């Protein structure tokens, strides 16, 4: 299913490239180089889908994700602990739309009320994961992808805070 050179996304870590396929203990493993944090991950090929591994989105999907980022915030639990768990579960799905929702909602919340330390860390990590995917999908370098996302979020969150 995945070949060396494929651009993939691994939930919790972000986008990377399959750099190697190898047999170990009678099982095939994929080695993925995650670009934004210089991490290498090995995943058994036969459980890659279960682990949430998927190919990087294309330009068409980027447009849809931008729509999510620019959309209205969705209702989140008021309790910090519940909200944190709710967002963590969304990130864990590996779904780019769920990830974009978390990023958007935390950006709006940061603009309106500020974020707790834990939520700030989650927001930063979620943005890095999304930016790493934009990097491949839009053929940008890491810094340009992060700057692009930050600019979109600042404009959108400011608009939502003013409108809300």
Region roles according to the model:
Residues 1-53:
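A positional/architectural concept
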Residues 46-164:
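Charge/polar-rich, low-complexity and marginally structured segments
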């Amino acid at each position: 299913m995945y070949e060396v050179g494929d651009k993939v996304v691994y939930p919790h870590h972000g986008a990377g490239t399959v750099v190697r396929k190898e047999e170990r203990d009678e099982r095939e493993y994929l080695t993925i180089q995650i670009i934004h944090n210089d991490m290498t991950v090995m995943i058994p090929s036969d459980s890659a889908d279960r682990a949430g591994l998927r190919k990087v989105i294309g330009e068409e999907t980027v447009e849809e994700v931008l729509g999510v980022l620019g959309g209205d915030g969705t209702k989140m639990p008021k309790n910090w602990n519940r909200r944190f768990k709710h967002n963590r579960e969304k990130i864990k799905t590996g779904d780019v739309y769920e990830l974009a929702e978390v990023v958007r909602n935390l950006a709006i919340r940061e603009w309106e009320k500020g974020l707790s330390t834990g939520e700030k860390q989650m927001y930063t990590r979620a943005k890095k994961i999304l930016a790493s995917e934009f990097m491949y999908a839009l053929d940008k370098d890491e810094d340009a992808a992060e700057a692009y996302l930050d600019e979109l979020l600042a404009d959108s969150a400011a608009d939502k805070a003013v409108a809300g």
